[in-house]
Amino acid sequence: MSKKNSKNKAGSSTIALNRTARHEYFIEERVEAGLSLQGWEVKSLRAGKANISEAYVIFMQGEAFLFGSTFLPLNAASSHVVCDPTRTRKLLLSRHELDKLESLTARQGYTIVPLALYWKECWVKVEIGLVKGKKEHDKREDTKAREWDREKARIMKNKHRG
């Protein structure tokens, strides 16, 4: 038997999305990283009990860590394992990627936030983005542009109907 040659996209097997990141930040660059997880965390991710909307990436001793994410334990979790839903999780990146991201975040106004959490085959991956915060007027401009695109689509739809 041959294997299927289907590539998993971030949207096809998504566990959690950070929807506010697109609204709050300009996304400069995207990087895929692995996560170092415990057994109960994998089980809760299979159940879809994850939240990355308040999370961000910090660098300590040359390593990258996901801070502020919440993986809720299942009710049937083992009683002899201490489940900390908000523990800091290590990101698995190459040394080259770590050095590059750490030097880019040293610049004024840049930070790294998780954009999506998803399955890639049997591995949990997190898509992180190098971002810069938006000002209030930038957010308003984006909202106006989105509303105008919606209005244009509505006009074209009605025009084609008759």
UniProtKB/Swiss-Prot annotation:
<dbReference type="InterPro" id="IPR020081">
    <property type="entry name" value="SsrA-bd_prot_CS"/>
</dbReference>
<feature type="region of interest" description="Disordered">
    <location>
        <begin position="137"/>
        <end position="162"/>
    </location>
</feature>
<dbReference type="InterPro" id="IPR023620">
    <property type="entry name" value="SmpB"/>
</dbReference>
<dbReference type="InterPro" id="IPR000037">
    <property type="entry name" value="SsrA-bd_prot"/>
</dbReference>
<dbReference type="Pfam" id="PF01668">
    <property type="entry name" value="SmpB"/>
</dbReference>
<keyword id="KW-0963">Cytoplasm</keyword>
<keyword id="KW-0694">RNA-binding</keyword>
<dbReference type="GO" id="GO:0070929">
    <property type="term" value="P:trans-translation"/>
</dbReference>
<dbReference type="GO" id="GO:0003723">
    <property type="term" value="F:RNA binding"/>
</dbReference>
<comment type="function">
    <text>Required for rescue of stalled ribosomes mediated by trans-translation. Binds to transfer-messenger RNA (tmRNA), required for stable association of tmRNA with ribosomes. tmRNA and SmpB together mimic tRNA shape, replacing the anticodon stem-loop with SmpB. tmRNA is encoded by the ssrA gene; the 2 termini fold to resemble tRNA(Ala) and it encodes a 'tag peptide', a short internal open reading frame. During trans-translation Ala-aminoacylated tmRNA acts like a tRNA, entering the A-site of stalled ribosomes, displacing the stalled mRNA.</text>
</comment>
<feature type="compositionally biased region" description="Basic and acidic residues">
    <location>
        <begin position="137"/>
        <end position="154"/>
    </location>
</feature>
<comment type="similarity">
    <text>Belongs to the SmpB family.</text>
</comment>
<protein>
    <recommendedName>
        <fullName>SsrA-binding protein</fullName>
    </recommendedName>
</protein>
<dbReference type="GO" id="GO:0005829">
    <property type="term" value="C:cytosol"/>
</dbReference>
